[in-house]
A protein has these predicted regions:
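Soluble catalytic regions of membrane-associated enzymes that act on cell-envelope
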Residues: 1-236
Length: 236
């Protein structure tokens, strides 16, 4: 009922709501300070990681738990597709159509790529992933979408030769170390950097790399929405 919604948000009539909705913020696109921007996509990350978290019984968030206290968290996000690459392209191109980069348009400059805004603002644009660079031909096609540099398993492994490799790539911690070095370079040059990262460690099969120790899972402490088979019982 519209009138109930108006009352709930403190309006006495529809005209009051329209006035607030019509307010425009006047901002400049020319920032005096251009910050470095890092956009990290975690493979297979879902709400169950947050819903299963228990600081004592099942610490699924690790150090992210304290970071979330000051973070803006959206818990209702939905993946654009049930697949890594379609979801990645959805973020890059804002479209459910996939795979664009492996179609006849794969080696064409796409004006609707979200990365172009950073490149036009003179950012150094980098795609960084723990998976092999030839995966889905990203080392070739992503340069057409605004990424100046693409780094993956080979580049990270060359820099950190002791890093353990998995069926899907190299451990996430090495990818983040690589990103830290890129950010330090940006500080030294004064040119801001945009880094889009795609992790691999959370991709099945779930094997923690580099001998890292993780806490055991107390199944009895998992939320009722997750049963022993790892599926949902419908009572979300």
């Amino acid at each position: 009922e519209p009138s109930q919604a108006l009352t709930k948000f403190g309006y006495s009539n529809i005209e009051e709501a329209k006035k607030d909705l019509a307010v425009r913020a006047h901002t400049s696109t020319q920032l005096s300070f251009r910050p470095n921007v890092v956009f990290t996509v975690m493979e297979s990350m879902s709400g169950d990681i947050f819903n299963s978290h228990d600081s004592l019984a099942n610490n699924t968030l690790g150090s992210l738990e304290t970071a979330m206290e000051d973070a803006v968290v959206f818990r209702k996000g939905v993946s654009i597709e049930n697949g890594t690459f379609p979801s990645l392209e959805g973020l890059l191109f804002d479209t459910p159509i996939s795979p664009i980069s492996q179609s006849i348009y794969g080696r064409k400059e796409l004006s609707f790529s979200q990365v172009r805004a950073f490149k036009e603002a003179c950012y150094r644009t980098i795609f960084l992933t723990g998976c092999p660079e030839p995966w889905r031909q990203i080392n070739d096609t992503f340069k057409f979408y605004g990424f100046e540099e693409i780094y993956g398993q080979a580049a990270i492994g060359e820099k950190f030769p002791n890093a353990e490799k998995s069926p899907w790539g190299i451990g996430d911690k090495w990818m983040f170390k690589f990103a830290e070095d890129l950010l330090k370079e940006a500080e030294g040059t004064g040119r801001p950097v945009f880094i889009m990262m795609l992790s691999t460690t959370n991709h099945p099969p779930f094997k923690v790399p580099d001998g890292e120790q993780v806490s055991k899972v107390d199944i009895s402490k998992l939320p009722k929405t997750i049963n022993l088979e790892g599926s949902y019982d419908g009572n979300m």
